[in-house]
Each structure stands twice: as structure tokens, then as C-alpha cells.
């Protein structure tokens, strides 16, 4: 990774960390895709959008994948960079407790 890429990575981590640490209201959603994977999202408002700050996926085989500012990506996936729009996206609202149980594994 060159210096420009490192700086960009650092800015991305700082952005998501700041959103997570300073959030006053959190929204939680889930989605099941056509492959049977279950996706859970924690999102916070930023600039009139709901930005995902934590994302968990339970794969069809039962594997739990988690992404946040502390772990943005790996060989299996990455924290989405797309905002959530509950009116447009195929997600349903879940409680903070449900999201927390999934996140904790």
C-alpha cells in the first residue's frame, strides 16, 4: 500500500470511527438474500443519509462475518459504502437487542 492509499484508508477508518463514537441515534436492519445469507446493519444518520457503521453477515453455512471501522474488509467481504434507504432497500427494521445478539456471535 503506497502513502496515498494509506492516507485514504486512515481517513476512511477515522470517518466510520467518528460516526460510531458520536452517534446519538442508531438504526438496525436485516436482510436475507437469495442465497440464504442473513445480513444485519447498524446505521447512523449523516448528511441526510443512513450510513452503515456495523455490518454482520451470517452465511448459509452459519459463518459470522463482521465489519466495522475496526475491521473494514477481508478476503470474504467489506463494510458497505452505500447508505441504507429503508423506503427503497429490501430491509426490515430490527431491535438494537437483536442486532447486538448477532454482532456478539
Where are these regions (language model features)?
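Generic secondary-structure transition motif, activating predominantly at the C-termini of alpha-helices
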Residues: 17-20, 45, 83, 103
